[in-house]
Regions:
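Conserved acyl-donor/pantetheine-binding loop and adjacent beta-alpha core of acyl/acetyltransferases
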Residues: 73-109
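Conserved GNAT-fold acetyl-CoA-binding loop/helix
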Residues: 28-48
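Conserved beta-strand-loop-alpha-helix junction that forms the acyl-donor binding cleft
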Residues: 109, 130-140, 158
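Conserved GNAT acetyl-CoA-binding A-motif
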Residues: 100, 124-135
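Conserved catalytic-core motifs of GNAT/GCN5-like acyltransferases
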Residues: 131, 149-163
Length: 179
C-alpha cells in the first residue's frame, strides 16, 4: 500500500477560496453524520474570520501533491484561548502553555487528513487542547484514537453552546516554532 504524503504550511490569501470550499464540504459531511448544528446553520466559519486568521499567522493548510485538502487554525501560548479559562464537569490536565486547534476540516479526498493535522499541531508544542460539539461523534472518535483525554465541558462565548473539551499532554516543552 502506497504511503500518502501530506504536508502542512501556513495559509495564504490565495488559499481562501479553496478553504471555503473545504468548509462547505465539512458542513455537508457533519450534517450527513448526525451533526447538522455545529457549523451548518450559520455557514461557519465566515470568510472574514479565515482572512483574520491568515493575517495573524494562525491559519494552516494541509496539502497532498500540491493541492489543498485540509485546513485548520493553530495557535500556541499561555492562556491562548479565553474560552478555556473555565471548564465545567472536570478540569484540565495541565495549566502550562498549550496549543489549540480550531476549525479543522478536510475535503474528503484523502484519508487521514484530520489525524495528520492534529498530530502536526501536537508535535509543535507537546500540549494540545481542542473542543467539539456533543453531536460530532466523528471528531470525538478521532480525538480518542489520538490519545486525547476528555476533560469536561466548555462554553463558547459567541453562542454559549456546550462543547466537549479534550486535552493531550506529553513530552516536549513547546519550544518548536510553527512554520
Amino acid at each position: 500500500m502506497e504511503q500518502v504524503r501530506l504536508e502542512i504550511r501556513r495559509s495564504a490569501e490565495g488559499d481562501v477560496g479553496r478553504m471555503m470550499e473545504i468548509y462547505a464540504h465539512a458542513r455537508a459531511f457533519m450534517a450527513a453524520h448526525g451533526n447538522p448544528n455545529q457549523w451548518g446553520p450559520t455557514n461557519w466559519p465566515p470568510e472574514a474570520l479565515i482572512r483574520r486568521d491568515i493575517r495573524q499567522g494562525n491559519s494552516y493548510v494541509c496539502t497532498h501533491e500540491g493541492r489543498v485538502v485540509g485546513t485548520f487554525f493553530f495557535a500556541w501560548g499561555k492562556d491562548i484561548e479565553p474560552t478555556y479559562r473555565r471548564i465545567a464537569d472536570g478540569a484540565w490536565l495541565d495549566d502550562g502553555p498549550y496549543g489549540v486547534v480550531h476549525r479543522i476540516a478536510g475535503d474528503g479526498s484523502v484519508k487521514g487528513v484530520g489525524a495528520f493535522c492534529i498530530n502536526w499541531a501536537y508535535g509543535q508544542c507537546g500540549h494540545l487542547r481542542i473542543d467539539t460539539h456533543g453531536d460530532n461523534v466523528v471528531m470525538q472518535g478521532l480525538l480518542n484514537k489520538l490519545g486525547f483525554t476528555r476533560c469536561g465541558t466548555i462554553y463558547v462565548e459567541e453562542d454559549d453552546y456546550p462543547r466537549l473539551a479534550y486535552e493531550k499532554v506529553g513530552q516536549g516543552d513547546g519550544s518548536s516554532v510553527p512554520l
